[in-house]
C-alpha cells in the first residue's frame, strides 16, 4: 500500500533537512514523498530540490512543488493533496521529525471505517533539545464522546500526528481554508461530529518542535488571528449543536484572553466549568449531510 508523506514547508531552511532525513529513515518503504512549499523567501526550495535529487531513488516517487501564492497551512495542505497518489497521507511540517517506525506503525493499526488517526507526540524543545511525551488525551471511544471531550477540555489532535485516508479526505472537501492556520481542530471536529471516530495509536511516533518564543503562545498578530479562528469555529459548533455550557465556557475564555494581558484567569474559570458534564440535549451525532463545512441549523434538528 502506497503512503504519501507530505512535508509542508515555509521558510523552513534551518530544519527541513532533519525532517527529510527522518522520512528517509522510515522502516516502511512504500512511500511517495512530496515537499510542498508555500512560497518561502529563504533557501528552502533549493535545499529541498538538492536533497530530493540525491535521494529520490529511495522512494516510489519524490518531488518538490510550490503553491502559486502564499495561502497558509491549510491551503498548502490542500495543494499538496492534489499531487498525491497514495492511499493514505502523512503530513509533517518542515521542522518536525518522524520516528523511524512512524509510517509502519500507523499502517499496522489501520482498521475498517476509521479514516483519521493520531498518536502520542514527542515535544522537542528547540532551545534545549529536551523531549517530553504528550499524550493524545482524546478517549479511544465513540465519535461523539471524542468530540465532547475536545470541546470540554479545549484540546485536539496535534497537526503533526495526522494520518488520514486520501479518498475520504478528498470527498469531504479537504482542509478548511477559511481558517488558514488551523489544520487540526476543524478536521477533528468535522470527522467526529459526522459520526467518524478518530483512531488512536498509543505510541510516540512524531517529534513536534516547540520554540520558546512560539508565535502560537505569544501576542503576535498570527497568534491572535489563530485564536480568533479557533473561537469562531468552536462557538458556531456549540451554538448549533445545543451545547450551552460549552458555549459559555468558550465565550468566557475568549473574553478573558482578549481583556487580560496574559489571560491570567482563563485556567481558573476553565477548571471550574469542567466540573460540569456538558451534554448535548439531542444526545446524538448530527451528520453534515455530505457538505463538509456546513453546520446543521437548529431548525433542521
What does each of the following model-derived ranges do?
Residues 185-186, 193, 198, 204-301:
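C-terminal subregions of glycosyltransferases and related glycan-biosynthesis enzymes
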Amino acid at each position: 500500500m502506497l503512503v504519501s508523506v507530505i512535508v509542508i514547508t515555509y521558510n523552513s531552511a534551518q530544519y527541513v533537512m532533519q525532517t527529510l532525513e527522518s522520512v528517509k529513515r522510515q522502516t516502511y518503504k512504500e512511500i511517495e514523498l512530496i515537499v510542498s512549499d508555500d512560497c518561502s523567501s529563504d533557501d528552502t526550495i533549493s535545499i529541498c530540490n538538492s536533497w530530493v535529487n540525491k535521494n529520490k531513488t529511495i522512494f516510489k516517487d519524490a518531488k518538490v512543488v510550490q503553491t502559486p501564492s502564499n495561502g497558509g497551512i491549510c491551503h498548502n495542505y490542500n495543494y499538496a493533496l492534489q499531487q498525491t497518489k497514495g492511499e493514505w497521507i502523512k503530513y509533517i511540517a518542515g521542522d518536525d521529525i518522524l520516528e523511524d517506525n512512524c509510517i509502519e506503525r500507523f499502517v499496522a493499526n489501520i482498521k475498517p471505517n476509521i479514516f483519521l488517526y493520531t498518536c502520542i507526540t514527542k515535544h522537542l524543545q528547540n532551545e534545549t533539545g529536551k523531549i517530553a511525551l504528550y499524550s493524545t488525551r482524546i478517549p479511544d471511544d465513540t465519535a461523539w464522546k471524542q468530540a465532547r471531550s475536545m470541546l470540554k477540555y479545549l484540546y485536539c489532535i496535534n497537526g503533526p500526528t495526522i494520518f488520514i485516508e486520501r479518498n475520504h479526505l478528498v470527498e469531504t472537501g479537504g482542509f478548511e481554508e477559511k481558517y488558514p492556520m488551523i489544520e487540526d481542530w476543524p478536521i477533528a471536529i468535522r470527522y467526529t461530529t459526522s459520526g467518524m471516530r478518530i483512531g488512536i495509536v498509543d505510541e510516540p511516533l512524531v517529534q513536534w518542535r516547540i520554540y520558546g518564543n512560539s508565535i502560537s503562545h505569544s501576542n503576535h498578530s498570527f497568534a491572535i488571528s489563530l485564536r480568533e479562528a479557533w473561537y469562531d469555529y468552536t462557538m458556531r459548533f456549540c451554538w448549533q449543536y445545543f451545547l450551552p455550557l460549552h458555549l459559555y465556557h468558550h465565550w468566557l475564555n475568549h473574553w478573558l484572553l482578549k481583556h487580560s494581558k496574559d489571560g491570567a484567569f482563563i485556567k481558573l474559570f476553565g477548571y471550574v466549568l469542567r466540573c460540569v458534564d456538558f451534554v448535548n440535549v439531542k444526545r446524538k451525532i448530527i451528520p453534515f449531510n455530505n457538505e463538509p463545512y456546513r453546520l446543521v441549523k437548529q431548525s433542521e434538528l
